[in-house]
Amino acid sequence: MKTIIVLSCFFCLAFSQDLSENNNNTATLCLGHHAVPNGTIVKTITDDQIEVTNATELVQSSSTGKICNNPHRILDGRDCTLIDALLGDPHCDVFQDETWDLYVERSKSFSNCYPYDVPDYASLRSLVASSGTLEFITEAFTWTGVTQNGGSGACKRGPGNGFFSRLNWLTKSGSAYPVLNVTMPNNDNFDKLYVWGVHHPSTNQEQTNLYVQASGRVTVSTRRSQQTIIPNIGSRPWVRGQSRRISIYWTIVKPGDILVINSNGNLIAPRGYFKMRTGKSSIMRSDAPIDTCISECITPNGSIPNDKPFQNVNKITYGACPKYIKQSTLKLATGMRNVPEKQTRGLFGAIAGFIENGWEGMIDGWYGFRHQNSEGTGQAADLKSTQAAIDQINGKLNRVIEKTNEKFHQIEKEFSEVEGRIQDLEKYVEDTKIDLWSYNADVLVALENQHTIDLTDSEMNKLFEKTRRQLRENAEDMGNGCFKIYHKCDNACIESIRNGTYDHDIYRDEALNNRFQIKGCGVKSGYKDWILWISFAISCFLLCVVLLGFIMWACQRGNIRCNICI
């Protein structure tokens, strides 16, 4: 019996210790921060995996699947390559004098005129693409003693034989092909592009039938350059019924310079010039459909948004585009360190502060207060510290975009087979640039994430220290982000602490008096829950023993009878 009395007193003492925290003479005030059940993992300088409440994806990994025609002027090449449109292939006549920001070449494009080759195809294609126009000005060249406007069955224009509309095929007149010597000055204030060619017959007989001389020659000169081409007579693989070829060349004539053409045969003469413009027009191979929409950035896969600093859709881009990197995802922390709230807090559901964990459900701020006093419990956000953290984080994404978005385009690189080593070197340089930017992106984002987490932790600590300085000796730091206030603190008192108007002198005497009274017989809070559980278990055990003893005593007295039937 004495044992039961002692344990009952011990249980009551522990129970009264818990209740003493919530009596009318004390209060508990905790500081905490926002938390979510499932956060987002980000990378920092010191930790590859740290959970935050919120993060923004920085890598654009998908396209719209279509090319937007605004704000860039897109010219759909359909079944015409840019060079075919330049030369005037009959099925490309619709592109005469067209302009563009981006010329889109399709995989289905084809040539449908006299078979030709361009020894410096990539340079000519790039030159015309960057000019952004096929504006053509016809000039009055004088070709005396030869037949003009030659045609071929390989280049039908309507029902009859035709030829490239921007070129003039010259052949003998009668039995003569005199030496041609024609000049054309550039008296304008812009560059002029002249496109011309050399015809390569398949046999010597064909050479003399067309040009009389057994071997022709074409020389095109300016003050800055000279090109002399000797035809290569011989049969080639058949293309559209022809084993002959035309080689296409080009010459740029600067303002004040002069074009000189000298030939004794095999000349495919220019009919005029293309007006060259300077700009940032370009060309791209893509089969993505063109649609009415708005996008600053275009890739062969389609347009992509440029609201992210990085993309891994395609290395080839046009417009103001995110930087291409290898990573498929990089997350920028836009929230604080996430510590999900514990679901249980001891036997009596005590509140706890930020040192233990965060608070879920705090929707009106990132930082705040929870209190427990004689009027109950409550919660309120601290908007000042919340706004201070948000202001420092808000500009991060825009700053990263400004550092990385390209305001120019990355064009396709093309080289002929003989320039293989140059192509390999160029590919190595491009791959190295991508590797470097991928590494830079990793470091940049990790640094920004580290800064975000540090500054949000700092705001929490600032709020805690501000509260500590207000309360002074009127409260005790409980070590978990909470203060035990040793005086009666109703809701108005709690509000004064939150808004910074608390006057500790008013409550000083009461707090000192209560502190000594409570500490005189207090049980250390770290062992309270253990004592309560042990006391409860022993009490239950003793209750069972007493009940069993009562049953045995009743059986002996005959008050309870137990019959066992077999």
From Swiss-Prot:
<dbReference type="GO" id="GO:0019031">
    <property type="term" value="C:viral envelope"/>
</dbReference>
<keyword id="KW-0812">Transmembrane</keyword>
<dbReference type="GO" id="GO:0016020">
    <property type="term" value="C:membrane"/>
</dbReference>
<dbReference type="InterPro" id="IPR000149">
    <property type="entry name" value="Hemagglutn_influenz_A"/>
</dbReference>
<keyword id="KW-1167">Clathrin- and caveolin-independent endocytosis of virus by host</keyword>
<keyword id="KW-1015">Disulfide bond</keyword>
<feature type="glycosylation site" description="N-linked (GlcNAc...) asparagine; by host">
    <location>
        <position position="24"/>
    </location>
</feature>
<keyword id="KW-0449">Lipoprotein</keyword>
<keyword id="KW-0472">Membrane</keyword>
<keyword id="KW-1160">Virus entry into host cell</keyword>
<keyword id="KW-1168">Fusion of virus membrane with host membrane</keyword>
<feature type="disulfide bond" description="Interchain (between HA1 and HA2 chains)">
    <location>
        <begin position="30"/>
        <end position="482"/>
    </location>
</feature>
<keyword id="KW-1170">Fusion of virus membrane with host endosomal membrane</keyword>
<comment type="function">
    <text>Binds to sialic acid-containing receptors on the cell surface, bringing about the attachment of the virus particle to the cell. This attachment induces virion internalization of about two third of the virus particles through clathrin-dependent endocytosis and about one third through a clathrin- and caveolin-independent pathway. Plays a major role in the determination of host range restriction and virulence. Class I viral fusion protein.</text>
</comment>
<keyword id="KW-1043">Host membrane</keyword>
<feature type="glycosylation site" description="N-linked (GlcNAc...) asparagine; by host">
    <location>
        <position position="38"/>
    </location>
</feature>
<feature type="disulfide bond">
    <location>
        <begin position="80"/>
        <end position="92"/>
    </location>
</feature>
<keyword id="KW-1162">Viral penetration into host cytoplasm</keyword>
<keyword id="KW-1165">Clathrin-mediated endocytosis of virus by host</keyword>
<dbReference type="InterPro" id="IPR013828">
    <property type="entry name" value="Hemagglutn_HA1_a/b_dom_sf"/>
</dbReference>
<dbReference type="Pfam" id="PF00509">
    <property type="entry name" value="Hemagglutinin"/>
</dbReference>
<feature type="lipid moiety-binding region" description="S-palmitoyl cysteine; by host">
    <location>
        <position position="562"/>
    </location>
</feature>
<keyword id="KW-1032">Host cell membrane</keyword>
<keyword id="KW-0946">Virion</keyword>
<dbReference type="GO" id="GO:0039654">
    <property type="term" value="P:fusion of virus membrane with host endosome membrane"/>
</dbReference>
<feature type="disulfide bond">
    <location>
        <begin position="113"/>
        <end position="155"/>
    </location>
</feature>
<keyword id="KW-1133">Transmembrane helix</keyword>
<dbReference type="GO" id="GO:0019064">
    <property type="term" value="P:fusion of virus membrane with host plasma membrane"/>
</dbReference>
<keyword id="KW-0945">Host-virus interaction</keyword>
<comment type="similarity">
    <text>Belongs to the influenza viruses hemagglutinin family.</text>
</comment>
<protein>
    <recommendedName>
        <fullName>Hemagglutinin</fullName>
    </recommendedName>
</protein>
<feature type="transmembrane region" description="Helical">
    <location>
        <begin position="531"/>
        <end position="551"/>
    </location>
</feature>
<feature type="disulfide bond">
    <location>
        <begin position="489"/>
        <end position="493"/>
    </location>
</feature>
<dbReference type="GO" id="GO:0046789">
    <property type="term" value="F:host cell surface receptor binding"/>
</dbReference>
<comment type="subunit">
    <text>Homotrimer of disulfide-linked HA1-HA2.</text>
</comment>
<feature type="topological domain" description="Cytoplasmic">
    <location>
        <begin position="552"/>
        <end position="566"/>
    </location>
</feature>
<dbReference type="GO" id="GO:0020002">
    <property type="term" value="C:host cell plasma membrane"/>
</dbReference>
<keyword id="KW-1164">Virus endocytosis by host</keyword>
<keyword id="KW-1161">Viral attachment to host cell</keyword>
<dbReference type="GO" id="GO:0019062">
    <property type="term" value="P:virion attachment to host cell"/>
</dbReference>
<feature type="lipid moiety-binding region" description="S-palmitoyl cysteine; by host">
    <location>
        <position position="565"/>
    </location>
</feature>
<keyword id="KW-0732">Signal</keyword>
